[in-house]
């Protein structure tokens, strides 16, 4: 793989570039044997900026000795015209989909920059902020029984199994109110859920993780402690899984899963149909 040339990939947009980068990453991930250097170029909203971007792409082609790959979500025809003649693999992500949709729907698109993000922010921004605040206020078991009633989902699992980042991702991306609750040795000794969780069992979803990975994560937090020892991690993971099986809680091993995969699985499991913001 070290002999494989590095290809420079540009993500060009007249907005933030997030859409171009997200779609581009999904496509590039299908080529694990390739190596890429990624460059995001946002806010290319006039011809001068597009021509400057075209110059950067030409210089990169000369330096690399191979033409770059360009993912574009430009909708304004003026800056788009400044990039049409560059020596690169030019992937116009909007053109691939907008033209067929216009033909199918029988109407012209608005070609408005950032149109999707504007709609999302105007209708759902408040709900997303509320979900983020909820996740932060109900992290690591900091919840009363009454507050848990407002949760869309309650994540359970041992400490450092990925509950907090998943809760925040669900809030930011989907506006889901996610609380999380750590399973601790006292729960394992009782071999049952705390009362406040038991009353909301329908909202529970468990996260587990390989003991070796858990020990590695905990060592970074508390080096050479019993908390981080592989023996303790094995005990906690085994006890947590037994408890979740006994309580019939759906759970997922997060060891080799991305946060996107974990979140999608949770949404499907608890039947939450939410749009991505």
Curated annotation (Swiss-Prot):
Any one GO molecular-function label of the UniProt entry: ATP binding
Keyword Nucleotide-binding: yes
Keywords assigned: Kinase, Nucleotide-binding, Serine/threonine-protein kinase, Transferase
Chain sites annotated for binding ADP: 157-164
Pfam family, one: Kinase-PPPase
Catalysed reaction equations from the record: [pyruvate, water dikinase] + ADP = [pyruvate, water dikinase]-phosphate + AMP + H(+); [pyruvate, water dikinase]-phosphate + phosphate + H(+) = [pyruvate, water dikinase] + diphosphate
InterPro entries reported for this sequence: Kinase-pyrophosphorylase, PSRP
Domain of life: Bacteria
E.C. numbers: 2.7.11.33, 2.7.4.28
Enzyme class: transferase
Chain's role: Bifunctional serine/threonine kinase and phosphorylase involved in the regulation of the phosphoenolpyruvate synthase (PEPS) by catalyzing its phosphorylation/dephosphorylation.
Family assignment from sequence similarity: Belongs to the pyruvate, phosphate/water dikinase regulatory protein family. PSRP subfamily.
Protein name: Putative phosphoenolpyruvate synthase regulatory protein
